[in-house]
From Swiss-Prot:
The keyword Transcription does not apply. ATP binds at residues 148-155. The lineage of its organism: Bacteria, Pseudomonadati, Pseudomonadota, Gammaproteobacteria, Moraxellales. This is ATP synthase subunit beta. Keywords: ATP synthesis, ATP-binding, Cell inner membrane, Cell membrane, CF(1), Hydrogen ion transport, Ion transport, Membrane, Nucleotide-binding, Translocase, Transport. It is an enzyme of class 7 (translocase). InterPro entries: AAA+_ATPase, ATP-synt_VA_C, ATP_synth_F1_bsu, ATPase_a/bsu_AS, ATPase_alpha/beta_chains, ATPase_F1/V1/A1_a/bsu_N, ATPase_F1/V1/A1_a/bsu_N_sf, ATPase_F1/V1/A1_a/bsu_nucl-bd. GO terms for cellular component: plasma membrane; proton-transporting ATP synthase complex. F-type ATPases have 2 components, CF(1) - the catalytic core - and CF(0) - the membrane proton channel. CF(1) has five subunits: alpha(3), beta(3), gamma(1), delta(1), epsilon(1). CF(0) has three main subunits: a(1), b(2) and c(9-12). The alpha and beta chains form an alternating ring which encloses part of the gamma chain. CF(1) is attached to CF(0) by a central stalk formed by the gamma and epsilon chains, while a peripheral stalk is formed by the delta and b chains. SMART domains: AAA (SM00382). It comes from Acinetobacter baumannii (strain ATCC 17978 / DSM 105126 / CIP 53.77 / LMG 1025 / NCDC KC755 / 5377). Produces ATP from ADP in the presence of a proton gradient across the membrane. The catalytic sites are hosted primarily by the beta subunits. It is a peripheral membrane protein. Belongs to the ATPase alpha/beta chains family.
Amino acid sequence: MSSGRIIQIIGAVIDVEFERTSVPKIYDALQVDGTETTLEVQQQLGDGVVRTIAMGSTEGLKRGLTVTSTNAPISVPVGTATLGRIMDVLGRPIDEAGPVATEERLPIHRQAPSYAEQAASTDLLETGIKVIDLLCPFAKGGKVGLFGGAGVGKTVNMMELINNIAKAHSGLSVFAGVGERTREGNDFYHEMKDSNVLDKVAMVYGQMNEPPGNRLRVALTGLTMAEYFRDEKDENGKGRDVLLFVDNIYRYTLAGTEVSALLGRMPSAVGYQPTLAEEMGVLQERITSTKSGSITSIQAVYVPADDLTDPSPATTFAHLDATVVLSRDIASSGIYPAIDPLDSTSRQLDPLVVGQEHYEIARAVQNVLQRYKELKDIIAILGMDELAEEDKLVVYRARKIQRFFSQPFHVAEVFTGAPGKLVPLKETIRGFKGLLAGEYDHIPEQAFYMVGGIDEVIAKAEKL
């Protein structure tokens, strides 16, 4: 165990001097003697000096303090003892429920599975949310991004997905809260506790108030726990299907930007770190399915200033199988979930995967909505009366489709008072098929708003 001393502190960046013969390796964890502070080596500056980033607050540190090298990367507890617990970036419990009872630990920096070990899957994961199941279906073992600006419902959508998938899915889940609000983390904990699935979820939080080093590594901590669950073999030699929720992947990038500037790297476009694509790749390449088990990940992605071409969301796009884009325009018109049916995509929306009927209905729905979008300008200038009869029909159907995409959520029940609805895929397809065929042309459009399946629409219309 080599030891050195602190020679410089600039915010979260600390320079430590070691003997030239015992300089720690990149990503080794160092412990500041007499404190709880852990440092991670980022650069070797020469002459025995290493530049490190602190994984916690640097308050109370001063030059000359002794630092001991652990000669290993940061490692965190893994296995079933982590379930039902809330941990920080170093795997220390922060839920005041005693230590995490496991001897097994893994380093947070690991290689992604090789090409030979990876396996793709086309099994669909039903979410019970109509617009997602119809237009951007999720794959088991796939990666999904929820893109949206501030306040359009990323976290609520993610909570509903957790509610619908994690509860129905008997497997294990890991939730990584990266640079988000502590209140949301607290809500999530109580939500899981109340629905009796807490014993199947491990939670890792590095929230907004944490230093950048902490927020930069907390996603890797959560991922390491998920990888262990995926790779742990049962008696038949099979791994597990694990769910990994990350809220919010943008804050991971942002923490990287803060660290990069502190380390003195030249910024690239829009002030992001020059290693943006590589850092994102290091995380995303590890979130994958192998021949023995799978990780299905759902990631919230904050979109700065609602600009999808910003380097951070643009880099994230490349790694995903399905993208769910939340739109401010749709949210402002009162339709929730505010998912943009024309912008959201999925690699699974293919007749060979979802079947010919589902594919054709999804594309027909998008065609109607696209035509309505084109007609909006004409309507704004000339009014509805100037449209051809068939265009009027398109408009009426499109407005019904838009309203039918809205759906009351279980997690929003406390705010709206409307009980949440979970719609099976077969019901969703049946409803939209009838809508396109004109079977419900006689029903007023308000009957389609905030309901579950098509049978509820008919029942609601009778009361109007």
